[in-house]
Design a protein with these regions (language model features):
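Long, low-complexity, charged/polar intrinsically disordered regions in eukaryotic proteins
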Residues: 1-9, 91-109
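Short, cationic-aromatic polyanion-contact patches
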Residues: 7-19, 68-95
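Small side chains
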Residues: 14, 33-36, 54, 76
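Short helix-capping/hinge SLiMs at alpha-helix to coil transitions
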Residues: 23-31, 53
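Short acidic, hydrophobic short linear motifs in intrinsically disordered regions
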Residues: 28-42
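Short amphipathic alpha-helical interaction segments
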Residues: 44-59
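A short, conserved structural fragment
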Residues: 58-69
């Protein structure tokens, strides 16, 4: 039973993390990304937990890892073509909810 609540909390943090990456990608451009320390500050998770979460999102194809000036950063990938910088925030948030809803967090909680 407690595993359910842990997965629910993890899903909420993954939602916040992915939402920030998607908004950044749409509004800041293709080179926008955050490193692990920035993601720790965003979600409130420790470094070990954030790396596990990011690798789960990488495995599902929502996030990619790239190197920017010798720093490993992460950015959102495969946003639908109907999302751009003129899209209302509610449409972007709905996409993020659907995308995170398809991710299985069972082994992480």
């Amino acid at each position: 039973m407690f595993g359910f609540f842990k997965r629910k909390a993890l899903k909420k943090r993954a939602f916040n993390l992915y939402k920030e990456l998607v908004f950044g990608r749409l509004y800041e451009g293709n080179r926008f990304g955050l490193n692990a320390e920035d993601l720790c500050k965003t979600t409130g998770l420790n470094l070990f937990s954030i790396l596990n979460l990011i690798h789960r999102l990488i495995a599902t194809g929502l996030v990619e890892e790239y190197e920017l000036v010798d720093v490993v950063c992460y950015r959102a990938v495969k946003e639908p073509i109907y999302l751009d910088d003129t899209s209302p925030p509610s449409i972007i948030t709905d996409y993020v909810k659907r995308a995170i809803g398809r991710v299985d967090f069972k082994g992480l909680a």
